């Protein structure tokens, strides 16, 4: 290895890396700020303009886009015609390229960033050099990640060159990196143009964790996250205690966070297998947790609990009495953390809460991807329609709205029975609505008397209304829209219960 081209925006570790290259007899070529950093550190360096014999221009937009650079990168060392061609133009081969790109992602995440600022942080020369070097990985080593500096230096010290396998691996990493970089730029500009569903979609995610296994032990799995910070997201969670999250932990935690984010008042949400098993609302977080626990003392065991307020010592004492896989909250008091951390297997996570989840959801299908807007429609309760002779009381309406927030997160067909303070029965995932209703009502038992019922979609028949009325339900909330709405309304009137239509469906598959 004789010549290296180094141009980086992230200068961590680059000076000692270059110093070692010089010790190994490698000539360093560099540009702009990187060249200045080398000169300041006393590292011998050749300026890019001395290689191209052409000055930087257009405020630095054109520096390395030159045959003297790309010819030195792309020439095949095993092809005589290539080597003769570059020699004829006095172009020398470049054996190592170390480049990382303008910080486009960091720029667009800044508050108040302008389009002009974003555009100026789109790197052109950097990706071009990386791609040229990566294409010719048979002869050229290309580094885009500071984590690979040591590997390259070790191989150079031991063998005088990098191995083919290392060059191939680094080239693959470069093409992943430039593809992700371009995807971020495309997404940013697409959002500005207002195109919701463009003809092509390229998604970029960063690997956060290789998981022990997936949904089952025979399935390999990893966790990838979107670039940047996503509030209310398990991807942005900070783990304070406990072993690594599993695949199922992550999915359950995501489900719990989505429900907890629906509420501004203190709420505790217990989840098993991506369905809530208990949700409690209170004047404080302790009361909320106790309500969630009382909602289903059996199912909460081994579950995931998300709370939207800081966990205090009293709440922690209650939670420490049972086995919980994960507790998620905005924060834990020092006393609460000390209490819960005594249980070595529990995972404690903090997540920034900021209202209900918005944006788009992506679901893979065999051979494709479904993308839809998140079910975060802002509903105006003033547009809800009372269609029965009996009007819901103020207390019933409060309970109906609370359970309506919850039922949208239960797998369809979904029925939730509850009060303004807690769920009392949850029927999830049945193939017919009456089946889910009977499960929810049976779970609620005697507590169904005086409670309310929420349904994620309309009643195809009046049997659910009749079953609810016979169990003691006093008010129902549902979207409406069935050709048999009239029959359901008449059944409600027959038993003297109120019914509210939201005109919004919340299927969840």
Curated annotation (Swiss-Prot):
The keyword Transferase applies. One of its GO terms (biological process) is 'de novo' IMP biosynthetic process. Residues 1-144 form the MGS-like domain. It catalyses: (6R)-10-formyltetrahydrofolate + 5-amino-1-(5-phospho-beta-D-ribosyl)imidazole-4-carboxamide = 5-formamido-1-(5-phospho-D-ribosyl)imidazole-4-carboxamide + (6S)-5,6,7,8-tetrahydrofolate; IMP + H2O = 5-formamido-1-(5-phospho-D-ribosyl)imidazole-4-carboxamide. GO terms for molecular function: IMP cyclohydrolase activity; phosphoribosylaminoimidazolecarboxamide formyltransferase activity. PROSITE patterns: MGS. GO terms for cellular component: cytosol. It comes from the Bacteria. InterPro entries: AICAR_Tfase_dup_dom_sf, Cytidine_deaminase-like, MGS-like_dom, MGS-like_dom_sf, PurH-like. Pathway: Purine metabolism; IMP biosynthesis via de novo pathway; 5-formamido-1-(5-phospho-D-ribosyl)imidazole-4-carboxamide from 5-amino-1-(5-phospho-D-ribosyl)imidazole-4-carboxamide (10-formyl THF route): step 1/1; Purine metabolism; IMP biosynthesis via de novo pathway; IMP from 5-formamido-1-(5-phospho-D-ribosyl)imidazole-4-carboxamide: step 1/1. CDD domains: IMPCH. Gene3D superfamilies: 3.40.140.20, Methylglyoxal synthase-like domain. Its EC number is 2.1.2.3, 3.5.4.10. The keyword Ligase does not apply. SUPFAM superfamilies: Cytidine deaminase-like, Methylglyoxal synthase-like. Keywords: Hydrolase, Multifunctional enzyme, Purine biosynthesis, Transferase. NCBIfam families: PRK00881.1, purH. Belongs to the PurH family. The IMP cyclohydrolase activity resides in the N-terminal region. This is Bifunctional purine biosynthesis protein PurH. The lineage of its organism: Bacteria, Bacillati, Bacillota, Bacilli, Bacillales. The gene is purH.
């Amino acid at each position: 290895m004789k010549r290296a081209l180094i141009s980086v925006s992230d200068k961590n570790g680059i000076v000692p890396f270059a110093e070692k290259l010089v010790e190994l007899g490698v000539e360093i070529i560099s540009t702009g700020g990187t060249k200045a950093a080398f000169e300041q550190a006393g590292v011998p360096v050749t300026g890019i303009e001395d290689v191209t014999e052409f000055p930087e221009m257009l405020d630095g937009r054109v520096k390395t886009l030159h045959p003297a650079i790309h010819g030195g990168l792309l020439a095949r060392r095993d092809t005589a015609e290539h080597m003769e061609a570059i020699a004829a133009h006095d172009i020398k081969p470049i054996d190592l390229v170390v480049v990382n790109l303008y910080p486009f992602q960091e720029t667009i995440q800044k508050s108040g960033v302008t389009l002009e600022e974003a555009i100026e942080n789109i790197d052109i020369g950097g990706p071009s050099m990386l791609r040229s070097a990566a294409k010719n990985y048979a002869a050229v080593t290309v580094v885009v990640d500071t984590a690979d500096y040591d590997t390259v230096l070790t191989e150079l010290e031991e063998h005088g060159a990098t191995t083919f396998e290392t060059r191939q691996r680094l080239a693959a990493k470069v093409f992943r990196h430039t593809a992700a970089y371009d995807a971020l730029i495309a997404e940013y500009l697409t959002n500005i143009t207002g195109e919701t569903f463009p003809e092509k979609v390229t998604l970029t995610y960063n690997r956060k964790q290789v998981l022990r296994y997936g949904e089952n032990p025979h399935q390999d799995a990893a966790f990838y996250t979107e670039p940047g910070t996503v509030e209310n997201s398990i991807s942005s969670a900070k783990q304070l205690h406990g072993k690594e999250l599993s695949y199922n932990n992550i999915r359950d935690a995501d489900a719990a966070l989505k429900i907890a984010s629906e509420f501004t008042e203190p709420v505790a949400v217990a989840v098993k297998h991506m369905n809530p098993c208990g949700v409690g609302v209170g004047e404080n977080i302790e009361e909320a947790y106790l309500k969630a626990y009382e909602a289903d003392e059996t199912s909460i065991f081994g579950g995931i609990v998300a709370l939207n307020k800081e966990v205090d010592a009293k709440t922690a004492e209650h939670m420490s009495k049972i086995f919980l896989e994960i507790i998620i909250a905005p924060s834990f008091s020092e006393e609460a953390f000390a209490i819960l951390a005594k249980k070595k297997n529990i995972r404690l996570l903090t997540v920034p809460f900021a209202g209900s989840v918005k944006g788009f959801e992506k679901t893979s299908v065999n051979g494709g991807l479904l993308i839809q807007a998140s079910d975060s429609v802002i509903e105006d309760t003033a547009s809800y329609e009372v269609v029965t002779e009996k009007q819901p009381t103020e207390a019933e309406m409060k309970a109906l709205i609370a359970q309506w927030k919850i039922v949208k997160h239960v797998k369809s067909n979904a029925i939730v029975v509850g009060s303004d303070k807690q769920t009392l029965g949850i029927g999830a995932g049945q193939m017919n609505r009456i089946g889910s209703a009977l499960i929810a009502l049976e779970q609620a038992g005697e507590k169904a008397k005086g409670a309310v019922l929420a349904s994620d979609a309309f009643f195809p028949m009046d049997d659910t209304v009749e079953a609810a009325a016979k169990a003691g339900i006093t008010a129902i909330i549902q979207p409406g829209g069935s050709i048999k709405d009239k029959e359901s309304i008449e059944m409600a009137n027959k038993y003297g219960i109120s019914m509210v239509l939201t005109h919004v469906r919340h299927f969840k598959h």
